[in-house]
């Protein structure tokens, strides 16, 4: 994730070369609903990682997919505050868990 953020952050004209932004899918997803994702990379996002993603803002990161039951509310607020669309995925969360966020 960090390598991708650094690469995209340092591009001068992303649209000219066909990069519209990143969709980060994971690593904050349910292990039981991981799909094709490698279980070794599934983990809770650290404060530092959330700060780094948010600092790139929606110029770089357009969407991040997370499992609500694994997400920390303050992380969601920070990402949404940076203009990043937080999407629900790879989850066993109930409707009530999702709407409470």
What positions do the PLM features span?
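Histidine/acidic-residue-rich, glycine-tolerant segments that coordinate divalent metal ions
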Residues: 1-101
């Amino acid at each position: 994730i960090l390598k991708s953020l650094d690469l995209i952050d340092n591009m001068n004209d992303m649209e000219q070369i066909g990069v519209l932004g990143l969709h980060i899918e994971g690593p904050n997803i349910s292990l039981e609903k991981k799909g094709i994702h490698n279980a070794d990379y599934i983990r809770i996002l650290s404060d530092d990682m959330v700060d780094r993603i948010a600092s790139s803002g929606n110029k770089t990161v357009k969407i991040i997919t997370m499992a609500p039951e694994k997400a920390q509310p303050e992380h969601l607020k920070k990402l949404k505050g940076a203009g990043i669309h937080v999407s629900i995925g790879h989850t066993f969360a109930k409707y009530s868990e999702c709407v409470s966020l």
